[in-house]
């Protein structure tokens, strides 16, 4: 476990004035939130990837909130709400991924064993909906917070409620929702993209 990352997340959650925060933190500690991967083989597919991804989403979301305000004059969302939805949007991934011996072909085409992650959730309840369910067991999410977490997958979610114009309706009325989705995409495909050589980009100028 990355103790510095845990301390950062706990401090951020405790900064939100919401009954049940301490109980929520106890749940995070009792689960594998701080050690779980963010996926089995894509972004954050390593120990601690889930917590790291959640912090990256928070950073991107705060940046979007500030930028939209300064550049477009849009009102800022409540910072406490941003902290909650960013750090809890993938709560559904706790107690879901487990290590197992897997097989793959090496560069010579020969089979080799390795230890990788497999998805074996203790509770099957969808993605965003499960995150909302778990969070609401400890704190009371507002309607906008719950909606933001529920729809954070955007068009990647194939659930029925996404196919009846509700996704666009939610984004058009709830800035917290589209900022969370955009921040999730930024964190996944930019900050956590191993194909982007940031050192080369940062030294070109």
Residue locations for each model-derived region?
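Short acidic DE-rich linear segments
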Residues: 203-205
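Divalent metal-dependent catalytic cores for phosphoryl transfer on phosphate-bearing substrates
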Residues: 74-199
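Acidic/His-rich, divalent-metal-binding segments that scaffold phosphate/diphosphate chemistry
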Residues: 1-106, 111
């Amino acid at each position: 476990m990355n103790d510095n990352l845990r301390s950062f997340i706990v401090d951020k959650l405790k900064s939100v004035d919401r009954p049940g925060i301490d109980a929520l933190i106890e749940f995070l500690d009792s689960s594998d939130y701080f050690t779980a991967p963010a996926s089995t083989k894509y972004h954050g597919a390593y120990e601690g990837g889930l917590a790291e991804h959640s912090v990256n989403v928070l950073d991107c979301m705060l940046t979007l909130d500030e930028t939209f305000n300064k550049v477009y004059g849009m009102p800022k969302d409540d910072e406490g709400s941003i902290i909650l939805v960013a750090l809890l949007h993938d709560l559904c991934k706790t107690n879901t991924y487990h290590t197992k011996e897997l097989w793959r072909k090496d560069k010579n085409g020969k089979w080799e064993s390795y230890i990788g992650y497999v998805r074996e959730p203790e509770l099957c309840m969808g993605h965003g909906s499960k995150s909302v369910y778990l969070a609401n067991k400890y704190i009371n999410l507002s309607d906008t917070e719950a909606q933001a977490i529920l729809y954070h997958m955007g068009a990647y979610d194939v659930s029925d409620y996404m196919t009846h114009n509700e996704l666009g309706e939610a984004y058009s009325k709830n800035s917290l929702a589209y900022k969370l989705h955009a921040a999730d995409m930024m964190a996944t495909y930019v900050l956590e993209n191993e194909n982007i050589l940031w050192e080369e980009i940062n030294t070109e100028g």
